[in-house]
């Protein structure tokens, strides 16, 4: 049995970025752990999730939820084991996931989006990916907003990231042609040869328009947009009449001081002429329906035989580096940070 320490190592925000997020915006610090109050429990975190939404939490501009301030522990989802408890709901030894922040130890009362993990679904860290936020995002974004039909073409930006990979799997499961838009020729090859996409395009290609036309010979019916920026403008030209655009992320503007500076060609004419439907999407709107996504994704994985890949960085001190590399697009699959005392599956 682990003996809880008097303090926990945490990743603390030392400055808000003006431009690209970098490791200098964070510092590793010790924060004291107080005694548990009634209803609380203590979690030893084993895994931290690194997600694109973290960009918005570090912006000073208004957003859909409160961000972080200088001196705060950086926000993040995590998975860990309950090591001490004053709660009737969470027992010693339970594995849980929640919005615990970038820290090794967390005190909670169950209100930080905490839920117990079913080990039968797979390794516990999958609660941060396919059976967590990424899965909810991909499933409900595609199925509820995109509403793909068999035989349609579904394109997804950040196509070999945690959400993009799942969008591809779900779309293929429903009989769609799948096209990954990625950031390198190596990822193009991986997307098609090992990750199950029908075609892939390098967004940095000098002949992007031609590449999109070749990858999507019948046009694009559903575009799952994780990036925004110039790439959105390019894909827009290939949308079919009646197409649907899911606005899920804006990682292409992560380098800007303010996202309002991300201004490209106006899209109103294309939306009008092609009768497109463009809708913003937040996974948190569907959190109460998470079991629906989990059940479907478990079925897809059983039929496909493999879990999506993970990109793991070791050590809490490396969490800022993991965030930076994810924003650069260096990862293939779910970006995770392992901080546990031992590998637990």
Functional labels for PLM-detected ranges:
Residues 207-218:
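Short amphipathic alpha-helix with an adjacent loop that forms part of the alpha/beta core around
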Residues 103-104, 183-191, 262-268:
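Short, glycine/polar-rich helix-capping loops at beta-to-alpha or helix-loop-helix junctions
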Residues 95, 153, 177, 243-244, ...:
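Short glycine-centered segments of the SAM/dcSAM-binding site in methyltransferase folds
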Residues 128, 132-206:
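Mid-domain Rossmann-like dinucleotide-binding core that forms the NAD(H)/NADP(H) cofactor-binding site
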Residues 32-50, 58-102:
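Glycine-rich beta-strand-centered segment in the early N-terminal region that forms part
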Residues 230-306, 341-345:
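Glycine-rich phosphate-binding loop and adjacent beta-alpha segment
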Residues 74-81, 89-158, 305:
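NAD(P)H dinucleotide-binding glycine-rich loop of Rossmann-like/cofactor-binding domains
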Residues 1-6, 284-345:
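C-terminal hydrophobic helical "lid"/dimerization subdomain
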